[in-house]
Amino acid sequence: CRYICPLGAALAIPSKFRLFDWLKRRKECGNPCQLCAKECEIQAIHPDGRINGNECHYCLDCQMTYHNDNKCPPLINKRKKRGKKAADPQLIPAVEVSDA
């Protein structure tokens, strides 16, 4: 289907004329993270993290993972770092102010 189907070839033509790339990627996508590439049923995501527009069916499964704080490894790492920074809260003493 990927190489022989004329419908697949016809669907790949509009991707050649894209004005902008609207599928988001992070610098961590591809190396070290391969989660989206493993989840892509079409295998349109290269090992380096680039999405092949000619093969992508725009199912947006990779984008669901990209924006999921509980699934995307770079977002999980950022959340853990934020949690470590906020782990030691500083207590501010309260002072009662009178209406005098």
From Swiss-Prot:
Keywords per UniProt: Activator, Cell membrane, DNA-binding, Membrane, Transcription, Transcription regulation
Top-rank taxon, per record: Bacteria
MF (Gene Ontology): DNA binding
Protein's membrane topology: Peripheral membrane protein
Annotated Gene Ontology cellular component terms: plasma membrane
Keyword DNA-binding: yes
Location within or outside the cell: Cell membrane
UniProt function note: Transcriptional activator of the nitrous-oxide reductase gene NosZ.
Protein name, as recorded: Regulatory protein NosR
Species for this entry: Pseudomonas aeruginosa
